[in-house]
């Protein structure tokens, strides 16, 4: 009888994947990133173990957005106090807080648990083409 192999956290082998966002659609990039961070592309995927790869996104500010999302889409924050709702347009977030925008969007695609937060820490986003992880990168997507 064959048994399913369950991966232990000590047996996980992680790769560093580089994604160039220039000219690619924002949402398509993020679905690929969420899959890589979760580890679902690996045959040894185990849902209760963080078996995903490290992902480095470069040229994040050069991603494409379809339609009029840059002017219309808004992100809301609330501190919990009355009247403290703040909103920022997608275009402003892309200019000023590119890294935060990508992490916020990917966070919605990952599990809402401590495991999901652990996966999100493996995402590195850079607005330009320069990044400090050149030595670690061993794959390009």
From Swiss-Prot:
GO terms for cellular component: cytosolic large ribosomal subunit. Transmembrane segments: none annotated. Keywords: Ribonucleoprotein, Ribosomal protein. One of its GO terms (molecular function) is structural constituent of ribosome. One of its GO terms (biological process) is translation. PROSITE patterns: RIBOSOMAL_L13 (PS00783). Part of the 50S ribosomal subunit. This protein is one of the early assembly proteins of the 50S ribosomal subunit, although it is not seen to bind rRNA by itself. It is important during the early stages of 50S assembly. HAMAP family: Ribosomal_uL13. Belongs to the universal ribosomal protein uL13 family. This is Large ribosomal subunit protein uL13. It comes from Sulfurovum sp. (strain NBC37-1). The gene is rplM.
């Amino acid at each position: 009888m064959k048994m399913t192999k369950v991966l232990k956290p000590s047996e996980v082998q992680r790769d560093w994947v580089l994604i160039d966002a220039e000219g690619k659609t924002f949402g398509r990039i993020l679905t690929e990133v969420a899959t890589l961070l979760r580890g679902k592309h690996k045959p040894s995927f185990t849902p209760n173990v963080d078996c995903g790869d490290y992902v480095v996104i470069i040229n994040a500010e050069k991603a494409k957005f379809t339609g009029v999302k840059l002017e219309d889409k808004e992100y809301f924050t609330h501190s919990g106090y009355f009247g403290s709702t703040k909103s920022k347009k997608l275009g402003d977030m892309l200019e000023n807080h590119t890294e935060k925008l990508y992490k916020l969007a990917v966070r919605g695609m990952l599990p809402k648990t401590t495991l999901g937060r652990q996966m999100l820490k493996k995402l590195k986003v850079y607005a330009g083409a320069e990044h400090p992880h050149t030595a670690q990168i061993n794959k390009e997507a």
